[in-house]
Design a protein with these regions (language model features):
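A detector of single, family-specific signature residues
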Residues: 1-201
Length: 201
């Protein structure tokens, strides 16, 4: 649909049309590469020892195949974190702190730890700006998953959508809101990974 609309654009100078066509070709090449890599991930996923965790994480809104696989590949065995707070700290999603004597000041997030996994959570967090609902794609991703995992994912969606609206309504910048949502989302990732570990045992 977008391609058709772009093809219909007319420019005063021919060089502008050449540049547009070049940009369209670059987007199409990137899309084909993404699709090819996604198919390869789908093909090897069943053989992976952490596949069940990656599949379970897809129950969360904003966490599709590539996002889930990246999170699990970057974090490894998520059950090694004793608490959600440890995972949040590892991801650099906790506030920095400067303390001196009796004064204590918190700043922005530390950005310590795994940047790739943190980016995946922040990307996923943007989807919580919309009202809570189970889309057709999300329903397909949740098919066959245990009820406790689906219940946790729905609880996450209700809480995070509400929190996103509340923070945005309070006038917080979008990046601050999204980072706060990503931090809480990490807690739900931790919970689902632990549910899968108990289910597998």
């Amino acid at each position: 649909m977008h391609r058709r609309w772009l093809s219909g654009l007319r420019f005063e100078q021919a060089v502008q049309h050449v540049v547009l066509e070049d940009l369209i070709a670059a987007v199409e090449a990137a899309t084909e590469r993404r699709d090819r890599l996604t198919r390869q991930i789908e093909a090897v996923l069943p053989e992976w020892s952490l596949a069940s965790v990656a599949q379970a994480l897809q129950a969360l809104r904003g966490v599709a195949l590539v996002n889930a696989v990246t999170l699990v590949a970057e974090l490894g065995d998520i059950t090694r974190f004793a608490s959600p707070r440890q995972l949040m700290a590892y991801l650099g999603l906790v506030p920095s702190e400067q303390s001196s004597g009796q004064s204590r000041r918190q700043g922005g997030i530390t950005k310590a730890g795994n940047g790739a996994a943190r980016r995946m959570l922040i990307e996923a967090a943007w989807s919580y700006r919309f009202p809570a609902r189970v889309s057709r794609d999300l329903l397909l991703r949740q098919e066959g998953l245990p009820q406790p995992v689906r219940a946790t994912a729905w609880k996450a969606q209700l809480r995070l959508c509400r929190r996103y609206r509340r923070l945005a309504h309070a006038g917080k910048p979008a990046t601050v809101v999204t980072t706060a949502i990503a931090r809480e989302l990490a807690g739900f990732v931790w919970a689902i990974a632990h549910q899968r570990a108990r289910h597998a045992a």
